[in-house]
UniProtKB/Swiss-Prot annotation:
Signal peptide: none annotated. Transmembrane segments: none annotated. Keywords: Repeat. The keyword Transmembrane does not apply. PPR repeats lie at residues 239-273, 274-308, 309-343, 344-378, 379-413, 414-448, 449-483, 484-518, 519-553. The keyword Ribonucleoprotein does not apply. Belongs to the PPR family. P subfamily. Coiled coil: none annotated. This is Putative pentatricopeptide repeat-containing protein At1g09680. One of its GO terms (cellular component) is mitochondrion. It comes from the Eukaryota.
Length: 607
C-alpha cells in the first residue's frame, strides 16, 4: 500500500548526496530546471534499470523490499539520475507493469540524494492517471501541496502549463484544486481555477464542483455567489439546484435583495425556475414581512405554469397569520383545498396559533377539529398552542383536558406545557392547582424555569401569600435562576400591601445588587407603600432619590404622593378640602400642590 510517509522525506530541504553529476544538478525540490526526456530510448542505463526492475519486482506487500535486496538494482543505482527516472516513466521501454514503476519511484525517492521537482511528481501522477491509478496519482499531488503549503498555487501550477496538451492533464488540474480545497486552502483552489483559464485549460469541472460545495459550508454567501458567476461564465454546467441553494442562504441571512438577484439570474441564463426556486424566494419575502412580493411571486409562478404546492401556501398563510390577517389566511386555505392540495399539520398549526393569539377560541377549536377530520394527529407543538389558547381565555378545564388527551395518546407534556398550565392557573387565582402541576413536573424530571417560578411567585402575591411567595423566590435563586423586574416588583407590592415596606426596600436593594435597574413602576409600588403608612417624609426622600439616579416619575408617581399628602396632612384630614388637581404632569406642579396642601393644613390648625 502506498504511504505518503515514505515519500515525505523526498521533499525535505536537506542537502543531497551525490550519485552522479546529473543527479546532483536536478536533486533539489525547488529546482527550476525543466525535466526533459532522454534523446534515446536505448540509453544503456535506462535499459539496465528496466531489466533490473522487471527481474526484481514482486507484488505488494513485498514490492519495496524487493528493490532493497536486489543486487542488480544496487549495481545500477550509482549511475542513475533524475532524468533516468523521468525517462522510465515517459517511455517505459520494456513495457513494465505500472505498479512496478510506481513502486520503484517510491523506493528511489527514499534513497539519499534523490530529490524530485514538482514537475517530476506531476509527470508520474499523469502516468498513473493514464493507467487509471487515480488514487495513487491523487496521493502524489497531496504530497506536493502539503509540502508547499498555503499560497503556493501559482508556483505549483506553473509546472502543469507545459503539460497542457498531454493526456490526463485535466485530471491533474482537477486533482490539484480538490487537494487545495480539502486542505482548507480555498484561495489557492480559486487561484488554480483562474490560472487554468489564463493558460486555456479545459474548465476543471470536478475541481470547481468540489470547491463550490466546500465554499457553501464555509464562506460568506456573497463570496460564493461571485465565484459561481465566475465559473459559469467560464463554461461550468448550469444547475438550477445550485441557484436554489444560494437563494436559500441569502434568505436565511435576511439578504432578500441578493436572493432576488439570484432568482433573476436563473431566467437570464435561460433556465426555468422550479417550484423550489419560487418557494424559497416567497418564503424569504414572507419572513421579512413583505407579503406583497410574496403574492407577486405566487402570481408569476402561476403565470409560468408552475403550480404552487403545499409549501407555497404554508409560507403565505403563516405570514398572513403573523399579521393577524386571519380572513386572508382562511381564503388561501380554501383555495389550496379547492385545487386538490391536502393541508399538512404545519398549516393547521399555523392557523390554530393565529386564532389562539387573537383570542378567537371558537375558530381555534374549529380548525383543530378540521385537522382531526383530515386524519392528522397533533404534535407537542400544536398541543401546547391549544393549551396556551385555552389558558389565555381562562378556560382552564379545557386546557387540562387537552393535556390529559395528549397523555392518553402517548405524548409526554414538556416544560412549555407545564409552564403554560402553571401560569394559567396562577392567573386564574388557583395557586393550589398550579402547585400540584409543579409536583407533577418534578415527578417527571422536568425542572421549573424562570417563567414557571415567576408565575408561582406572582400568583401567590396576588393571593396575599407573601411568605410562600418569598419561599418560592429563594428557591428560584438557589436554582441559579435570576428573577426579572416584574417578579421583584410583585414581591415588593405584596409586602407593601401587608404594611411591610421595610421588606419591600430590602428586596429593592437585593434587586439592585443583582444588576437590575428598577423602573418607575417599581418605585411607584414602594411610594404607594410608604404613603399608605403615612411616611410622607420618606416618600419625598424616595422621590428625590429617583430623580438623582435618572428615573423619571410619571403621573402615577405624583398622584400617589398627592393622595398621601392629602390623606396624612393632619389628624383632622377629613376637614381639609382636597384640591381638584386632575393629573399632575411634572415635579413643579407636584410641589405647588403640596405647598397648597401644607398651607391649607396650617390654616385649619390656626382656626
Amino acid at each position: 500500500m502506498f504511504r505518503i510517509e515514505i515519500l515525505r522525506c523526498t521533499l525535505s530541504q536537506s542537502h543531497p548526496q551525490r550519485f552522479s553529476r546529473a543527479s546532483f544538478l536536478l536533486s533539489t525540490w525547488y529546482s527550476q530546471e525543466s525535466v526533459s526526456a532522454a534523446d534515446n530510448d536505448d540509453d544503456p542505463v535506462l535499459v539496465k534499470l528496466s531489466v533490473a526492475i522487471r527481474d526484481s519486482y514482486k507484488d505488494p506487500p513485498l514490492e519495496f523490499s524487493s528493490f532493497t535486496d536486489c543486487p542488480s538494482i544496487r549495481k545500477v543505482l550509482p549511475s542513475l539520475s533524475v532524468h533516468h527516472v523521468v525517462d522510465l516513466i515517459n517511455h517505459n521501454p520494456l513495457s513494465l507493469p505500472q505498479r512496478s514503476i510506481f513502486a520503484f519511484f517510491k523506493f528511489i525517492s527514499s534513497q539519499p540524494g534523490f530529490r524530485f521537482t514538482v514537475e517530476t511528481y506531476f509527470v508520474l501522477a499523469r502516468f498513473l492517471a493514464v493507467h487509471e491509478m487515480f488514487t495513487e496519482a491523487q496521493s502524489l499531488i497531496e504530497l506536493v501541496v502539503s509540502r508547499k503549503g498555503k499560497n503556493s498555487a501559482s508556483s505549483v501550477f506553473i509546472s502543469l502549463v507545459e503539460m497542457r496538451v498531454t493526456p490526463m492533464c485535466g485530471f491533474l488540474v482537477d486533482a490539484l484544486m480538490i487537494t487545495y480545497t480539502d486542505l482548507g486552502f480555498i484561495p489557492d483552489a480559486i487561484q488554480c481555477f483562474r490560472l487554468s483559464r489564463k493558460h486555456r485549460f479545459d474548465v476543471p469541472i470536478r475541481g470547481c464542483g468540489n470547491l463550490l460545495d466546500r465554499m457553501m459550508k464555509l464562506n460568506p454567501t456573497g463570496t460564493i455567489w461571485g465565484f459561481y458567476m465566475e465559473i459559469l461564465d467560464a463554461g461550468f454546467p448550469l444547475n438550477v439546484y445550485v441557484f436554489n441553494i444560494l437563494m436559500n442562504k441569502f434568505c436565511k441571512e435576511g439578504n432578500i435583495s441578493d436572493a432576488q438577484k439570484v432568482f433573476d439570474e436563473i431566467t437570464k441564463r435561460s433556465l426555468q425556475p422550479t417550484v423550489v426556486s419560487f418557494n424559497t424566494l416567497i418564503n424569504g419575502y414572507c419572513k421579512v414581512g413583505n407579503l406583497d412580493e410574496g403574492f407577486r411571486l405566487k402570481h408569476q409562478m402561476e403565470k409560468s405554469r408552475t403550480r404552487p404546492d403545499v409549501f407555497t401556501y404554508s409560507a403565505l398563510i403563516n405570514a398572513l397569520c403573523k399579521e393577524n390577517k386571519m380572513d386572508g389566511a382562511h381564503g388561501l386555505f380554501d383555495e389550496m383545498c379547492k385545487r386538490g392540495l391536502i393541508p399538512n399539520d404545519v398549516i393547521f398549526t399555523t392557523l390554530i396559533h393565529g386564532h389562539s393569539r387573537n383570542g378567537e377560541i371558537d375558530l381555534m377549536k374549529e380548525s383543530y377539529q378540521k385537522m382531526l377530520s383530515k386524519g392528522l394527529q397533533p404534535d407537542i407543538v400544536l398541543y401546547n398552542t391549544l393549551v396556551n389558547g385555552f389558558c389565555k381565555n381562562g378556560d382552564l378545564v379545557a386546557a387540562r383536558n387537552i393535556v390529559d388527551g395528549m397523555i392518553r395518546r402517548g405524548l409526554r407534556p414538556d416544560k412549555i406545557t407545564y409552564t403554560t398550565l402553571i401560569d394559567g392557573f396562577c392567573r386564574g387565582g388557583d395557586v393550589e392547582t398550579a402547585l400540584e402541576i409543579r409536583k407533577e413536573m418534578d415527578q417527571n424530571g422536568i425542572e421549573l424555569d424562570r417563567v414557571g417560578f415567576s408565575a408561582l411567585v406572582c400568583g401567590m402575591c396576588k393571593e396575599g401569600r407573601v411568605i410562600d411567595a418569598e419561599r418560592a423566590l429563594r428557591e428560584m435563586l438557589r436554582a441559579g435562576i435570576k428573577p426579572d423586574d416584574v417578579t421583584y416588583t410583585m414581591m415588593m407590592d405584596a409586602f407593601c400591601k401587608k404594611g411591610d415596606a421595610q421588606t419591600g426596600f430590602k428586596l429593592l436593594k437585593e434587586m439592585q445588587s443583582d444588576g437590575h435597574v428598577p423602573s418607575v413602576v417599581t418605585y411607584n409600588v414602594l411610594l404607594n407603600g410608604l404613603c399608605k403608612l403615612g411616611q410622607m417624609k420618606n416618600a419625598d426622600m424616595l422621590l428625590d432619590a429617583m430623580l438623582n439616579i435618572g428615573v423619571v416619575p410619571d403621573d402615577i408617581t405624583y398622584n400617589t404622593l398627592l393622595e398621601g399628602h392629602h390623606r396624612h396632612a393632619n389628624s383632622s384630614k377629613r376637614y381639609i378640602q382636597k384640591p381638584e388637581i386632575g393629573i399632575v404632569a411634572d415635579l413643579a406642579s407636584y410641589k405647588s400642590i403640596v405647598n397648597e396642601l401644607d398651607r391649607a393644613s396650617k390654616d385649619h390648625r390656626n382656626r
